[in-house]
Amino acid sequence: MSSKFLFTSESVSEGHPDKMCDQISDAVLDAHLKQDPNAKVACETVTKTGMVMLCGEITSKAVVDYQVLVRRVIEKIGFTDSSIGFDHKTCNVLVALEQQSPEIAAGVHVNKDGEDVGAGDQGIMFGYATDETEETMPLTLILSHKINAELHKLRRNGTLPWVRPDSKSQVTIEYESRHGATIPLRVHTVVVSTQHSPDVTLEKLRETILADVIKKVIPASLLDESTVFHINPCGTFIVGGPMGDAGVTGRKIIVDTYGGWGAHGGGAFSGKDPTKVDRSAAYAARWVATSLVKAGLAKRVLVQLSYAIGIAKPISVLVYAFGTSPLTDEELHQIVEDSFDLTPGKIIKELDLKRPIYEKTAENGHFGHSEFPWEQPKALKISPALLEKAKGNPIPATSAIAH
């Protein structure tokens, strides 16, 4: 059986105030990990007009100049003058950082071997993968991310000098659901809102973004005469960034993950060192899901992990393939159990998570980028019997579109 439906995902640029905060929090984390790979970091950032505040708990041997660090990130994003809405040179940087609670430290990592470290908190984490794109990510989100990335590439290289750092994109795709798989058919609607300088007309802005960004990013085969484009539908967007809206770390968790597909456990990523399973276990769940899909064992996979604070072994592991696998969910679960050690210490070791790699994750999504280790599929341990069953019952063809 098959049916058609619409699904929408959104993305925001690095100049969106919430994303600014994510990048600053992860820059703080990277600065500590660069000097002290065992640093324990939980750093939140808040921003509003002319102000950035860091707050949280950090236990580290590193010495970090937060004033220099915060201003460097804001300058990189592009807020370099008050006429744009924020100035990295003159903004106030407030610091309210304390040490990690000794009770949490005692329960999680003190006097424990690196591989025996307990989960930094309780919680549930999800991973998702789909064969609809090469990245095993939902096409709605991939296109939303790519629109923002292309827009700001053109801003940075001077091609579109009137574009400013704050923007949002949203893509709606018509899908066909077939045997549990999701097949993109066409782009139904595209929404782009970008901050801009006062000297560009809305007509020029809309024409340029449609021709030089949207139609450059989205394959022509997915666009038709019925596709709807809303470009700055509210009109002018001159006041942006923290002047337009307050920003807080961790408020774009759906943009960070799967664009509304799969599921989300509620925990944000940015500013957290890898002993926090909100981050490391979510990366591991994605690693599991994409490994199964890239191995051809399913067309779509959802993985749920849960943990208790101070306990290393997951409380539960769920593998759900939406009926798209020749194997049962129980058999896929067995492959996962045989192939992955999902304790925090092992996750950190196998994915090499004590490195300063996190600021980049806060810019354009944590998943779907091949440079991140959790995106590289793991060789799976599959019993001869299950391997034979998988080969003998191929996944039904769904003729997914090429991207």
UniProtKB/Swiss-Prot annotation:
In the Enzyme Commission scheme, what number(s) does this protein have? 2.5.1.6
What keywords are assigned to this protein?
ATP-binding, Magnesium, Metal-binding, Nucleotide-binding, One-carbon metabolism, Potassium, Transferase
Q: Does the keyword Transferase feature in the UniProt annotation?
A: yes
Kindly state what the record says about how the cofactor is bound: Binds 2 magnesium ions per subunit. The magnesium ions interact primarily with the substrate.
Q: What InterPro entries does UniProt report for this protein, alphabetically?
A: ADOMET_SYNTHASE_CS, S-AdoMet_synt_C, S-AdoMet_synt_central, S-AdoMet_synt_N, S-AdoMet_synthetase, S-AdoMet_synthetase_sfam
Summary of the knockout phenotype: RNAi-mediated knockdown causes an approximately 65% decrease in S-adenosylmethionine (SAM) levels, with similar decreases in S-adenosylhomocysteine (SAH), the product of SAM-dependent methyltransferase reactions. Increased levels of lipids, including triacylglycerols. Increased nuclear localization of transcription factor sbp-1 and increased expression of known target genes of sbp-1, such as the fatty-acid desaturases fat-5, fat-6 and fat-7.
What the entry lists under Pfam families is as follows: S-AdoMet_synt_C, S-AdoMet_synt_M, S-AdoMet_synt_N
Molecular function in Gene Ontology: ATP binding; metal ion binding; methionine adenosyltransferase activity
Q: What is this protein called?
A: Probable S-adenosylmethionine synthase 1
Q: Record the organism.
A: Caenorhabditis elegans
